[in-house]
């Protein structure tokens, strides 16, 4: 793949995609799509893909039961930003799952604590592959692949 240098603005009438290429196989993997509008998930368990979801705002709707959002295999630089698009506090749980226990979260989550115990939410950096939001009423969660194994979360 050639390198290009641009000295002025770059324009796309659709989107920009960043990709990675496996040195051994030549396989191209889409990492982030820039320029597309938000993606609204349905009221069901969801499995994300880099090509469809990375680099785009992901809106989680009001949910009627516990729901799991499963991340794709991590590709360094892929980024998922989630916000809540419902109108009221949920009584169900929303679970973010890395898809494998060997792929864990690193980082912490800032949150509004409704029961005043002021507990900090953070991953231990060696085993937390799931994050569960319980009775949430609003959220903004960012998850980015640190490398091909782990996810940064904030």
Q: Where do the model's predicted regions map?
A:
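Exposed extracellular interaction/assembly regions and N-terminal maturation sites
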Residues: 9-11, 15-118, 145-154
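Long, leucine- and charge-enriched amphipathic alpha-helices
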Residues: 2-3, 11
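Low-complexity acidic/polar repeat-biased segments
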Residues: 128-154
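Residues that act as N-cap/strand-start positions at coil-to-secondary-structure junctions
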Residues: 4, 63-65, 137
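Short aromatic-glycine motifs in intrinsically disordered, low-complexity regions
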Residues: 1, 67-70, 131
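Short solvent-exposed loop/turn micro-motifs enriched in small/polar/acidic residues
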Residues: 3, 124, 134-136
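Solvent-exposed loop and beta-edge segments used for protein-protein assembly and interaction
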Residues: 6, 74-76, 135-137
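Contiguous ligand/interfacial binding patches
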Residues: 114-129
């Amino acid at each position: 793949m050639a390198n290009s240098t641009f000295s002025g603005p770059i324009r796309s009438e659709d989107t920009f995609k960043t990709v990675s290429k496996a040195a051994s196989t030549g396989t191209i993997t889409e990492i982030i799509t820039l320029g597309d509008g938000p993606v609204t998930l349905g009221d069901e368990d969801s499995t994300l893909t880099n090509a469809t979801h990375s680099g785009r705002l992901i809106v989680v709707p009001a949910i009627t039961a516990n729901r799991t959002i499963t991340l794709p295999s991590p590709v360094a630089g892929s980024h998922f930003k989630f916000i809540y698009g419902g109108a009221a506090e949920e009584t169900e749980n929303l679970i973010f799952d890395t898809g494998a226990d060997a792929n864990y979260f690193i980082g912490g989550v800032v949150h509004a604590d409704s029961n005043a115990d002021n507990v900090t939410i953070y991953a231990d950096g060696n085993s937390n592959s799931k994050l569960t939001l319980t009775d949430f009423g609003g959220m903004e969660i960012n998850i980015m692949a640190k490398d091909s194994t782990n996810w940064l979360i904030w």
